Amino acid sequence: MKPVSRGMVLKILSAVMIVMAGAAGYALHSMRWLPWQKPVFDKAIPANCVAATDKAILIFSKTNGYRHASIEAGVKAIKEAGQKRGWEVVATENGAYFHEICLKSYRAVAFLSPTGDFLTDEQQRAFEQYIENGGGYAGIHSAADCEYEWDWYGTMLGTRFRSHTFLPYPIPKAEIVTEPGLHPAIDGLPARWSKKDEWYNFHESVRGKSGFQILLTIDESTYPAFWPKAMRGDHPIAWSRSMGKGRMFYTAIGHNASTYSDPTAMRHIMGGIAWAAALN
């Protein structure tokens, strides 16, 4: 048997180190919150938090963990699209907006890729009352990957983020399937359409859960679902439900800034926000 050369040993060791570094990087990235990151909570109620009109939407994008570079593009696009619809659109990263005085002046709150824990117990209760009394919620992308200790929030969503596409294809192009049915978030969308994104896997599908309407699914056969394995079949990525007198809409798309210049994606997002706000 021919002895292994020193060069070959070094190549093998390098490959092993790369794999280990990748696994460690994935583990840290999947945490979306790191032990040395301390949540910052806002407690002083802003003096100007009340909306000026009765067609107001609040965009909330506070990050106490990983921050998506697409947030600024998302805020800009939603503001512009909302204003064309005659809405007042206010954007904030101040958790103190989650107070009865502020919240009741908005038709819906859009959680635009927030991460970590960002609301106090009192602010969480204020939001729960807001939704149950008729307010709207629209969650975008990592809105399913935050506030893990808030049980009510997880119940509202119906499931939680588990993992997402990673190396060697972190942002693959995949085909999205528009589910049959009527809903402003899918009105006018193609039956199938392609998009690049960071595709989320969830702990479970919300299909079949009482009150949930699936809006979009992803065809797992159209993108490389290596490790971590995707959801092995039925893979919803957008859905809605009524909760109390309120409405919730969630879509997993939105990791990339390009989402917010994509007419099909924006039609979906704005339709979902409009439905949540009862402005459709």
Where are these regions (language model features)?
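Helical hinge/lid and interdomain linker segments adjacent to catalytic or ligand-binding clefts
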Residues: 11, 59, 69-147
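Solvent-exposed loop/turn segments at secondary-structure junctions
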Residues: 63-66, 95-98, 114-118, 137, ...
